Structure formats: C-alpha cells, structure tokens
Amino acid sequence: IYNQVPHWSKHFPMPAKLHYRETENPEFIYFPACVTRIFGGSSLGKDDLITVVLRIADKAGIKISVPRSVHGQCCSQIWEHKGDPKGQQITANATVEEFYKLSQNGRIPIFCDTTSCTHTLLTLARHKGLLTPDNLTKLNLLKILDITQWLHDHVMPKVTVKHKKKHVLLHPTCAARLMNVDTVMTEIAHMCADNVTVPPDSYCCGAAGDRGFMFPEVARSATRD
C-alpha cells in the first residue's frame, strides 16, 4: 500500500477551476491535460495554466474553444503507466472519438498543454490493437499540436513582448526531446527573455508520470544538480 499512495506536499497547488469556452467557428480546440486540471495556480497567487492560455489567445486574436466535454478526456498515458491495458484501451478510444467529433472530423486543429500527453496522443497508433480500426482512421485525420508548437507558430507572430525577462532557466522535458520541440521551447524563451540557459545535463526530472509522487527520492536524485 505504501508504494501505491502518493506522498503529499504542502506545495501542491489546489485543483484548477474548470474553464469552458464555446466559440463559434474556432481556429483551435484547446485540450487542457489531466495534470493541468488537477493542479491549479501556484500558492503564490498566480493564475492557473488554463486561464493563462485563454488570455494569451485573446491577446493574439486567436479564437479557441474549450468545450465542456474535453475536461472528461485523457490521453490514456496514466493507464499505461499503471499496467492497465484495458483502462488504456477504453480511455484512448473514447478520447479519439470525442476529439474527432469536436474537431469536426479533423478539420479544426487540437492543441494540448502538456507535452508528454501530446506525445502519447501522437503515438497511440504504435500500440497494436489499442484503437479500433474506425478510431485508428479517425486518429490519422486529427491535427494534434503541442502547446509549444501552437505558441511558436501561431501566437508569437501575432504578439509583441514588451517586458522581457532578464534571464530564463529552461528545462526541456523528456517528451519535448522525444518530439524534437525542445528547440522550439528555446526559441520561444529567447523571444521572451534577454538570456536563456538550458543546463547541458538537464535530462529526466524523475517524475515519470506520477512515479515521482510515489518515490520522491527519485525526483530529488534526478534534480540534485
């Protein structure tokens, strides 16, 4: 039981307020990942990620929609991590079906705000037998973007950064490296800061899904430098 119950920390933010935005003829569908919905803004009083993304989209004049039903979807990664193939199969198929419907048969691009979840969605087809033949076809018609790509390609060309940070320290995640969007993250950071540092030895943070909650010593060891 000990290894199945996450360690609690007073630094964990409370759940985010669920935001909905039904937009007529949206340019993008915004999918807030489970981790975004579970953890809200920091204890320092900063806004949660969903609020920030909606505000950025408004500043860029980009019409995005956050339908109510997206809050019930999951990329299925957690089920894979827990060794539950049936749960993974049910969740993955349900999400693909809902995304296909929300995107109007794949016409409207969908972006996800958590890179590891984006990577999971984009690689569902690699799991033989995970998706039904019908949903595999639907998946191939979906246009799924990571938030880094959405920011770089669609937001940054439409906004002007007036107050740059002096220095930003960047930690590209494992999924960002797998998707080759770590360079995209760095380019965005350079647009927002005078100096950007990416530590040469910044590799896995030790989180590994929720494993860092179960074994915090792994995360401490991975980030000790």
Regions found by a protein language model. Give the residues of each.
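Iron-sulfur cluster-binding electron-transfer modules in prokaryotic oxidoreductases
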Residues: I1-D225
